[in-house]
Amino acid sequence: MDLIYQNPTDLSHEEAIERVKQELKARNFGVLWEFDMTKKLAEHDLDLGAKFVVLEVCNPQKAHQVLSKDIAVGYFLPCKMAVYEKDGQVFVGTIKPSFLMGQLPGLDMPEIAAEVEEILQATVDALAG
């Protein structure tokens, strides 16, 4: 099973970030934090040579549901999405919740992981170009 689900998009980096936010909102998810990795590295005089932004996203009801079953799931929350450039192409992607949850022994929540994964993948697919 692959860890990452991603697609290229025809949108600019900035447009893709805004569109991800819109798509997530339409699916009852919110962006808790937007981390500009390129900017952070530049503060340390390190040039990444491309734009890379991590979005931490969450649906409070889903988070409560999984945390109530096993607090250790908190290591994987909030869900991560990324918008980045590589070789002149913008990509949008996410880490698959089903893969992450499969890493905790005894954790049995495939339905919840599948629901969240479907939403995140639909968000990525909405930007595919």
Task: Describe the function of each predicted region.
Residues 1-28:
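Terminal, regulation- and interaction-focused segments at domain boundaries
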